């Protein structure tokens, strides 16, 4: 059974989790500013100033409508919204899939520079080599079954392999 802060997932635990799905759920008609306002109204721990700083660093204008932006920019906006929360748990589903290497670098820097350092961070990915340097522990799941749960150092020492090669 999965517990979040000692409780089963439910209405009360959702306020502690910041989730980035693999596919966007943001409405294309909305402006970036609408989305920032929505997240600020919805989540007590949302840091509006942090969101606007990250948006500004990418030259994304608050008045831009999502439907006018590239897929990569939309994904970055969604990541910015998720990482602008001071959550206890961040769950990121394939955050670097389908983007070019430069965008991957930006995404990883955004994650590392903006998550709550007291929080836990779970990243689901098939691109292990791109994130291996930031991992502490890994869980491998195959066909819905837990295959391995270990520290990265343990895999390297006992197996003599990188996590990606394992």
Regions found by a protein language model. Give the residues of each.
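Helical segment within the ABC ATPase nucleotide-binding domain
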Residues: 104-117
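Conserved ABC transporter NBD signature motif
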Residues: 1-13
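A short, surface-exposed alpha-helical micro-motif characterized by mixed small hydrophobic
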Residues: 131-135
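ABC-family P-loop ATPase nucleotide-binding domains
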Residues: 19-77
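ABC ATPase "signature
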Residues: 149-150
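Catalytic Walker B motif of ABC-type/P-loop ATPase nucleotide-binding domains
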Residues: 90-94, 99
């Amino acid at each position: 059974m999965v517990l979040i802060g000692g409780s089963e997932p439910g209405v009360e635990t959702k306020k502690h989790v910041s989730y980035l799905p693999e596919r966007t759920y943001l409405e294309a008609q909305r402006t970036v500013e609408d989305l920032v306002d929505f997240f600020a109204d919805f989540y007590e721990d949302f840091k509006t100033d942090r969101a606007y700083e990250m948006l500004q660093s990418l030259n994304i204008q608050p008045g831009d409508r999502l439907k006018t932006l590239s897929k990569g920019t939309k994904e970055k906006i969604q990541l910015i919204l998720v990482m602008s929360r001071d959550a206890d748990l961040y769950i990121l589903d394939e955050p670097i899939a389908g983007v070019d290497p430069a965008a991957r670098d930006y995404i990883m820097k955004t994650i590392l520079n903006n998550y709550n350092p007291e929080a836990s961070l779970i990243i689901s990915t098939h691109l292990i080599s791109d994130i291996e340097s930031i991992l502490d522990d890994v869980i491998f799941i195959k066909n819905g079954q837990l295959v391995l749960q270990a520290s990265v150092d343990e895999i390297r020492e006992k197996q003599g392999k990188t996590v990606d090669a394992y």
